[in-house]
Amino acid sequence: MARQTRKVSPTKIKKRTYRGIVYIQAGHHNTIITLANLRGEVLCWSSAGACGFRGKRKATTFAAKKAAEVVAKKSREFALNEAKILVTGPGQGRETAIREIFKAGIKVNVIREKTGIPHNGCRPPKKRRV
């Protein structure tokens, strides 16, 4: 019988994207950071919860810093050197996450604030009586 040779497929090659968009969603309870290319296809993401923080520690600035470090480390695989930053939400980790992206050596073109402001939208929850 003839021996069959197995074809070894090469490992998946990461696409080189030199420009991208960093989305920072800073909520009251968590900070989610997403890195996408200019078409909007997600390359990588991280959050305070994914970095191991639980409960009210997810809302801290330190947790947002760690999440931004993880995304910055992953961005090196894609050779990202220029980015737009789009920030949404009222959370604490906004400025800390932006600072970490600067520290990673990514050149930032634009920082855009996209937090929605209601024009007398939803009724707020009732006041707590403790």
Swiss-Prot record:
GO terms for molecular function: rRNA binding; structural constituent of ribosome. Its main location: plastid. Pfam families: Ribosomal_S11 (PF00411). Transmembrane segments: none annotated. Signal peptide: none annotated. Gene3D superfamilies: Ribosomal protein S11. Keywords: Chloroplast, Plastid, Ribonucleoprotein, Ribosomal protein, RNA-binding, rRNA-binding. One of its GO terms (cellular component) is chloroplast. The keyword Membrane does not apply. GO terms for biological process: translation. It is found in: Plastid, Chloroplast. It comes from the Eukaryota. Part of the 30S ribosomal subunit. NCBIfam families: PRK05309.1 (NF003698). PANTHER family: 40S RIBOSOMAL PROTEIN S14/30S RIBOSOMAL PROTEIN S11. Belongs to the universal ribosomal protein uS11 family. This is Small ribosomal subunit protein uS11c. It comes from Tetradesmus obliquus (Green alga).
